[in-house]
Every structure is written in C-alpha cells, then in structure tokens.
Amino acid sequence: MKFSAVILAAGKGTRMHSNMPKVLHTLAGKPMVKHVIDTCTGLGAQNIHLVFGHGGDQMQTTLADETVNWILQADQLGTGHAVDQASPRFEDDEKILVLYGDVPLISPETIENLLDAQPTGGIALLTVMLDNPTGYGRIIRKNGPVVAIVEQKDASEEQKQIKEINTGVMVATGGDLKRWLSGLNNNNAQGEYYLTDVIAAAHDEGRAVEAVHPVNAIEVEGVNDRAQLARLERAFQSMQAQKLLEQGVMLRDPARFDLRGELQCGMDCEIDANVIIEGNVSLGDNVIIGTGCVLKDCEIDDNTIVRPYSVIEGATVGEECTVGPFTRLRPGAELRNDAHVGNFVEVKNARIGEGSKANHLTYLGDAEIGQRTNIGAGTITCNYDGANKFKTIIGNDVFVGSDSQLVAPVTIADGATIGAGTTLTKDVEEGELVITRVKERKITGWQRPVKQK
C-alpha cells in the first residue's frame, strides 16, 4: 500500500521538566519517536517526514541513523501548521498518514485498518471512546457521519458531553490535504492552526470522513508527563509479557518483567521476577533465568541455568552451562558447553572451554581457557599494563590454585598446576607445578602492636 507518514515531534514537553525533547524520552529502552518510526518502516512507508523543533540538535544526533526527511517547524503554531511544513513533499496521489512522536504504542494493525478505511477523496480518522474525555477534541457527527472536530477550549457545554474523542491520527490523500491545509485559519481560543479543521473542510466539499477505532485504546494514549510515560511503560511491558506467555515462555511474575528489545525463546524457558532483557537476546530450550538478571545482546543455549542477579552482555553461553549467582559476563565472553562460572566472577573478551570452571571471585579478561580446567577462587588475569592489553592462554586440564595472579602475556600448557598464591610471570610447560609463595616463617614471642595513648 503506497503511503507516506508525517510524524509530529516538534513539541517542547514542558511538563516533562527535562532538558531533553519529550519524544526522545524512552519507552522500553527506545525513544518514543523511534517506536513510531519503526512502525512506519515496518509497514513499508515510502517516506517518513519527521517534523521537529525544540531540541533539534539532540533529535538529529539521537536519530542520526534513521531514514527520515527532517522538517523544521521553527515556530510552533499548531498541528495544522506542523503538517503544512511537510506538505511540499507530498505527492498528490499518495496516502498521507499523520502520526505523533509522543504516541508510541500505535500498532501496525491499527494503522493498516486506518489506511484501508480511507474513503476515496476523503479522510480516515482514528477516534476512541473515553469515559472522561476532558482535554480532548470532540468528534461531531450529524446523522451518523463525522462532520467536524471541536477542541476542548472551543467546545460548547453540550459538545463537552460527547465521549468520542479525536486522537489526531488520520489519513488523507496528499493533494487534498495540501489544499485543505492552505485554507486553515487560527480564529480559535488557542490562536493556532488546527489540523482537526481539515475535517470540516472535507465535509464542506462533500468528502466522506470515516472514523476507525484502534485495536486497543492504550495505543492512542499520548505522553505529556513522566507519570503518563510510566503508565505506558507498564502497559507496553504487560503486552510484551502476554505475548511471551502465549508463546510458551514461563514468566513467574509477568508484572515484574521488562523487555527492552527483542527476545527469542526455545521450548520450556523459565524467567523469574525482575529480569530485564535489552537489545537482541536468544534463549535455547529449557533455559532458566533467575530473579534480578540483566541480559543484553547475548545468546544462551539449551539447558543452561543463569542464577540470580547475573549480568550478561554481548556474550555467548553454550549448552548445559551454569552462570551465577552474581556473575558478570561482558562483551566477548564465550562459555563453551558445560562451563561453570559462579558468584562474583567477571569474564570479558575471554573463552572458557568445555567443562571448565571458575566458581568464585575471579576476573578473566583477554584469555583463552581450555577444557576441564579449574580456576580457583581469587584468580586474576592481569591483562592490562596501563597502556596495552595482553592475553592469557590456559590449556586443558589445568588447575589454578586460589589467589593466583596470571600476569599476561603468559601461557599455561595442558595439565599444569599453579599453586595457591602464585604470581605467574613466565610460561608453564605441560604437566609442571609452579608455586611462587614466600617461604613460611614462624616468629615466636611476637607482640601485636597496641594503640599509643
């Protein structure tokens, strides 16, 4: 379906009490306006005209990778004026969809319904019924058809009783919309050029106006303050959780789950409360994620358990692994099948081989660790000299004792043993035992220091 979109995003958002443009505030980890852009892109919009004003530099920096036409509205003179700034780019025969950068939850299904409903030469308008319509423009009908929209400040007492309200979202043909916009005036209580006045203009020409309701009323809720944004966040997360439950994912507490990206799950996955998913995350079959974990841009294979309060970012975890509790896997971390990393272990840019373990209090950075190797508690790969980073290579079946420092670059061959407390600075041959502890001494009659009076 051939259409272009105009996204209005020029408002300041005074009630947000923020230095950032309102539409850049995030919902599910993504700027509100980015949700709208992504929806239009997914539907195949030919052009996306983004009307911006306040905080223009921030807008263009944050959305630098988006394929949009940047349309400046230097003076905010109303919604009609905003759309008119983009009108020189409209093709006469294309559908023009008007959306809002602070209405982030509008769904592809609702937009498709609206595009399909546009009568030839007329307007399709998205409306919704509200028990409390205060503050919204009212839909005026005459014997059924929509004939006008009256804003709250211009409405009579009788019109204020109407519960059907305008969402501002509409579709019209480019040539018609340009003509109607050119005829707008600002003779109203706000002194603004209302986009809603094109409804009356279309009616005066005998054009049909078709009203369509959204699939879900929450889709058309806008954001004016942080309380509204928080409410939409919870609504969005509830919808995401419901989809995952329907797909077979066991969310132990759907009300305490946040998805801020994309999640792919295999069969029989279980996610406990207060888990946060960011970026692109993939879980295999029978994966268990404990409470309080944060997963970002990572892949976790079948039958792996991630125990509570672990953070995994930019990492790959194999099958049958155990992670945590309180583990941090940083970008470049790779755990092969049946690897174990436990509490207060940090791994960065390192591969831990099949069946190997680092169960306690360990930092492994810029390292390659072979199979069936045991890394004792308190082991540190000393990979950074203040200017450059160096690699530690540990072979198969190696035992590294507790409280060891491995000063890179260093290689430990297969089957070697590193005694507890060792500071290793040289390579170790296959099967060797290395120990660098200071010889133990016993001092009899030693007196512990006392505080001076």
UniProtKB/Swiss-Prot annotation:
Binds 1 Mg(2+) ion per subunit. GO terms for biological process: cell morphogenesis; cell wall organization; lipid A biosynthetic process; peptidoglycan biosynthetic process; regulation of cell shape; UDP-N-acetylglucosamine biosynthetic process. It catalyses: alpha-D-glucosamine 1-phosphate + acetyl-CoA = N-acetyl-alpha-D-glucosamine 1-phosphate + CoA + H(+); N-acetyl-alpha-D-glucosamine 1-phosphate + UTP + H(+) = UDP-N-acetyl-alpha-D-glucosamine + diphosphate. InterPro entries: Bifunctional_GlmU, GlmU-like, GlmU_C_LbH, Hexapep, Hexapep_transf_CS, MobA-like_NTP_Trfase, Nucleotide-diphossugar_trans, Trimer_LpxA-like_sf. Residues 248-453 are annotated as: N-acetyltransferase. Residues 1-226 are annotated as: Pyrophosphorylase. GO terms for cellular component: cytoplasm; membrane. Its EC number is 2.7.7.23, 2.3.1.157. Pathway: Nucleotide-sugar biosynthesis; UDP-N-acetyl-alpha-D-glucosamine biosynthesis; N-acetyl-alpha-D-glucosamine 1-phosphate from alpha-D-glucosamine 6-phosphate (route II): step 2/2; Nucleotide-sugar biosynthesis; UDP-N-acetyl-alpha-D-glucosamine biosynthesis; UDP-N-acetyl-alpha-D-glucosamine from N-acetyl-alpha-D-glucosamine 1-phosphate: step 1/1; Bacterial outer membrane biogenesis; LPS lipid A biosynthesis. Residues 227-247 are annotated as: Linker. Its main location: cytoplasm. Acetyl-CoA binds at A377, N383, Y384, S402, A420, R437. Mg(2+) binds at D102, N224. The active site is at H360. Its cofactor is Mg(2+). Gene3D superfamilies: Hexapeptide repeat proteins (2.160.10.10), Spore Coat Polysaccharide Biosynthesis Protein SpsA, Chain A (3.90.550.10). One of its GO terms (molecular function) is glucosamine-1-phosphate N-acetyltransferase activity. It is an enzyme of class 2 (transferase). Pfam families: Hexapep, NTP_transf_3. In the N-terminal section; belongs to the N-acetylglucosamine-1-phosphate uridyltransferase family. Catalyzes the last two sequential reactions in the de novo biosynthetic pathway for UDP-N-acetylglucosamine (UDP-GlcNAc). The C-terminal domain catalyzes the transfer of acetyl group from acetyl coenzyme A to glucosamine-1-phosphate (GlcN-1-P) to produce N-acetylglucosamine-1-phosphate (GlcNAc-1-P), which is converted into UDP-GlcNAc by the transfer of uridine 5-monophosphate (from uridine 5-triphosphate), a reaction catalyzed by the N-terminal domain. Homotrimer. This is Bifunctional protein GlmU. It comes from Vibrio parahaemolyticus serotype O3:K6 (strain RIMD 2210633). The lineage of its organism: Bacteria, Pseudomonadati, Pseudomonadota, Gammaproteobacteria, Vibrionales. The gene is glmU.
